[in-house]
Structure formats: C-alpha cells, structure tokens
C-alpha cells in the first residue's frame, strides 16, 4: 500500500507522538469521554489524510440527525471507508466491523477508541449478541455504522447486495437510518496509486421510523441501496 507509506513518510516526526497517543487512548478508553476519543481520531486522521495526498469532499452534513441515537449505512469499498467518514462527520459514532479487521494495525486501535464491536459472521450466536448490544446502545443515544454489504465491493463504485439482516438493529431500536454514499474510497488504498485523490462522502436524508415501520428489512435494504446507487451515479466522474 504505497499511499500508507506516503502517509507515514510525510508525517515522520508526528508518527511516534500520534501512534503513542492513539495506543494510549485505545488502552484506556474509559478514562476519556467519547467526544475526547473521537476528536483525537479526527486529528490523527486529518494528519494521515493530508500526508496521503487525499481530500474528503463532504455533502449533506445537514442530513445528520440533530439528536444522537441513529445509524449510518454506507456502501463498502475498502479499508479507507471509516477513516473518510470520521474525518467529516461532526458527531462521534461507533462501528460494527467484521472480526478480521480487529487484527489490522492502526484500524484495530481506531476501533478500540470507538468502542466498536467485532462480528464473527460464521458465529450466529455471537452475531446476535452484538446486534442486541448495538440495539441497547443506540437506544441509549450512541450512534453506529454498519456496512450492510457485509464485505467490501470488488467493483469499485458499484455496491453489492445490501443484506437485510444488517438492518435489524435499526428496526428494533426504531432509530433513524442514514444512508451514506461513498465515491472513490476504494482508490485510496486498493489501487497502488499515490496521485491526488478526492473521496466523496454523501450523507443522504435519513429514513425515520415512521417511514420504514411497515417495511420488511429486505425492502429497507433495497431502498437504502437504491438511494446510494442513485447518488453515486449522479456524482461519479465519467
């Protein structure tokens, strides 16, 4: 990953300090408020993004609910997705990530700071326990992000099927569902290029409980995907 190396080289003097502080916060999460941990992540993220020839172009920030206790559902393009959203989202959120990412350097510390949940897709019982915990925390006012595709798309800006089960936490907690359209996020780490790159993050209008309460989760999944796909097609560079 040439761009990650570029991020490190351009932040050579910052890396020891930033890495130590990130590890410290990740190991002592209960000493800091969620707001404090999130602002640290944004600061470290900003340094990495600037060093990596990246720019995040955010749209629809006004669509993020004013009250906490909502869920983001973005399309999934790659390892940079969460970092792109962290950089431009003004309010803290946590993540439900697949178990494999808990061993990825840097990301595992980011997720620790966010008090994220790791889900083992092969273990139904563990997955259900995670969903129940997310429901409880969303009802208590925490915000979460789930990638409804389950795994990143291998087709760039073309999302895969959105899995209906990913929306159970939202429907059970009756929270606002915020679709998020990511454009060109996969190019950050997955193409081998270090050219200047703009990643687009579009926060779409939320679906509130009154809108989806009579819909099946399969219908919700299809509608969220449709809105994201339409946004990508309107904004993608031909």
Regions found by a protein language model. Give the residues of each.
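Non-catalytic C-terminal accessory region of glycerolipid acyltransferases
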Residues: 4, 128-238
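Residue-level "edge-of-site" marker
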Residues: 61-62, 124, 183
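Catalytic core of membrane glycerolipid acyltransferases/transacylases, capturing the structured
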Residues: 21-25, 37, 51-52, 66-124
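Membrane-anchoring hydrophobic helices of lipid-metabolizing enzymes
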Residues: 1-70
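Amphipathic coiled-coil/heptad-repeat helices and related helical stalk/stem segments
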Residues: 57, 78, 103, 127-131, ...
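Short acidic-hydrophobic, aromatic-tinged amphipathic segments that line or gate anion-handling sites
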Residues: 58, 117-120, 209
């Amino acid at each position: 990953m040439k761009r990650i190396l570029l991020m490190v080289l351009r932040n050579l003097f910052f890396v020891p300090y930033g890495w130590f502080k990130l590890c410290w916060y990740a190991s002592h999460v209960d000493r800091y408020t969620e707001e404090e941990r999130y602002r640290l992540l944004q600061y470290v993220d900003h340094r990495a993004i600037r060093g990596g020839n990246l720019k995040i172009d955010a749209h629809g920030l006004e669509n993020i609910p004013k009250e906490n206790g909502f869920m983001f559902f973005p399309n999934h393009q790659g390892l940079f997705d969460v970092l792109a959203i962290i950089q431009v989202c003004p309010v803290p959120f946590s993540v439900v990530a697949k178990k494999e990412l808990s061993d990825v350097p840097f990301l595992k510390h980011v997720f620790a700071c966010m008090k994220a949940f790791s889900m083992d897709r092969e273990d139904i019982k563990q997955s259900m326990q995670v969903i129940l915990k997310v429901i409880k925390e969303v009802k208590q006012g925490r915000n979460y992000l789930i990638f409804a595709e389950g795994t990143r798309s291998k087709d760039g800006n073309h999302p895969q099927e959105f899995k209906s089960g990913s929306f159970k936490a939202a429907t059970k907690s009756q929270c606002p569902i915020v679709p998020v359209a990511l454009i060109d996020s996969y190019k950050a780490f997955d193409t081998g290029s270090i050219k200047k790159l703009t990643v687009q993050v579009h926060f779409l209008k939320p679906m509130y409980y009154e809108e989806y309460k009579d819909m099946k989760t399969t219908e919700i999944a299809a509608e969220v995907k449709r809105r994201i796909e339409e946004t990508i097609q309107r904004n993608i560079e031909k």
